[in-house]
């Protein structure tokens, strides 16, 4: 398995005025988004630069502050064309090039605001795992879907809108997201996402892990205040942040897959106490037909605190698909 780390997208946000956004609307082709009944709050999108890596969102309000948001795909912006799988690794040199291209786009749409006035509103820490087969992507996606949720995090399915039930079920089948108030974590099949959303086909089998940090979390993690310096600082911490998050999910990079029979053999031959072995066997057997580790904990009737401790020590997880008898064990049990 090959891993590739970097930045997929980030967003910049700055305060504006009603009249300034009105001038931008006059000069550019805008797509109208949601608005309230009396048009006191309106949302617009400038999609002319989306293929080049920048989507511009305008929030125009008579009763609240108005905002301009830039959603930036830095790899596409620097390449001047859409890069579906490339991840950005910022350096001081590439950041200068990035700011130059952003300044050019802002001048073209008629926004005179300095780039320094923008704030980093969202940052996506991204890790792409490359597998040899699509079945491996589905297998690991199922493992994540069955993982133990951390406190204050909740699963966030795709909203059911005007799309058909088939598309809605397909989206939730190929992606999994959990979130709290300040960050969200998504795992999804990148090839499926590109095919369905962007009509782009790729040969690579990629499982994308994406940790999205909000403005609140960014301010806690960064000592710098300028958005360009924050990008550099966050990128330096990215590996440690992602590894820490995966560790909290009890799914570190060191985890490996074994069969159901192998799992029982590992438990039997380990140096664990007989009482612990008995509980681990119960967990493995109950995991065979449960949809999540939370359901396993209820069926085994092991105390929640003890169950979490055992997950931390032994990192047991099982694939969601019953026909695929795989159990992932961490190095602690296998040692």
Q: What kind of region is each of these model predictions?
A:
Residues 293-298:
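Short alpha-helical "recognition helix" segments of helix-turn-helix
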Residues 306:
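Residues in the helix-turn-helix
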Residues 310-313:
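Residues in the recognition helix of alpha-helical DNA-binding motifs
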